């Protein structure tokens, strides 16, 4: 039986052997692995890019105080970004499942059309959900736009839901029962040992104790600072500005979880973040162009 961490190790090794640069998680709160600059920003411009990484993802509204067996406000994704998207991307994915001990000839694996959109990033793509014996475990996306800019060449994204894959492989129905690791003395460290307390306390904060007034001020401050950086002409500050956009995005998600934003206000906030994302995307492409798109081998 593969432990949670062994699944990660195997995916890292598999994609490294396929030519991907295995990088580390982004050190900020994001709602999905897509928001890591290694996918979102690298999808822009003509430079090739092949990377794989684990990304902790936060969705405050999905917290359930640690009581729900398969719904979390903090979880893990394994992200693969392939640009340009190879013609055999689905075959590569199926090979990665074989590496985990999942034989496509034995199991019911279906690709279900499901196009993707992230309104706050001004991003969308054509894609599929991958269902393994009736459970969604992966999302495929061919990026079409980020920040309103066309992606040329198209980046192919594969996003594995690590918890769901692990629950299937280990045959458990409660995420907290997953075996994360085995210790040298033979003891088992479970997912619950690692994260149950975090789910309880973060859910309590997200829904009951977060300060809506303070969060609103934070959102406005992040937005103002991002605009200030984007207005600088004598230096490229696309990456610091993008981090401020992500901070604004997470703050918005906390406000949403707290119930502090009305339906009408929600659309307005999303529009404000999207406007920043578009400006960042433009600045990022300009900065790479000034560098001569260095990843394009002459």
From Swiss-Prot:
<comment type="subunit">
    <text>Tetramer of two alpha and two beta subunits.</text>
</comment>
<keyword id="KW-0963">Cytoplasm</keyword>
<keyword id="KW-0030">Aminoacyl-tRNA synthetase</keyword>
<keyword id="KW-0067">ATP-binding</keyword>
<dbReference type="GO" id="GO:0006426">
    <property type="term" value="P:glycyl-tRNA aminoacylation"/>
</dbReference>
<dbReference type="InterPro" id="IPR002310">
    <property type="entry name" value="Gly-tRNA_ligase_asu"/>
</dbReference>
<dbReference type="GO" id="GO:0005829">
    <property type="term" value="C:cytosol"/>
</dbReference>
<dbReference type="Pfam" id="PF02091">
    <property type="entry name" value="tRNA-synt_2e"/>
</dbReference>
<protein>
    <recommendedName>
        <fullName>Glycine--tRNA ligase alpha subunit</fullName>
        <ecNumber>6.1.1.14</ecNumber>
    </recommendedName>
</protein>
<dbReference type="InterPro" id="IPR006194">
    <property type="entry name" value="Gly-tRNA-synth_heterodimer"/>
</dbReference>
<keyword id="KW-0436">Ligase</keyword>
<dbReference type="InterPro" id="IPR045864">
    <property type="entry name" value="aa-tRNA-synth_II/BPL/LPL"/>
</dbReference>
<dbReference type="GO" id="GO:0005524">
    <property type="term" value="F:ATP binding"/>
</dbReference>
<keyword id="KW-0648">Protein biosynthesis</keyword>
<dbReference type="GO" id="GO:0004820">
    <property type="term" value="F:glycine-tRNA ligase activity"/>
</dbReference>
<comment type="similarity">
    <text>Belongs to the class-II aminoacyl-tRNA synthetase family.</text>
</comment>
<keyword id="KW-0547">Nucleotide-binding</keyword>
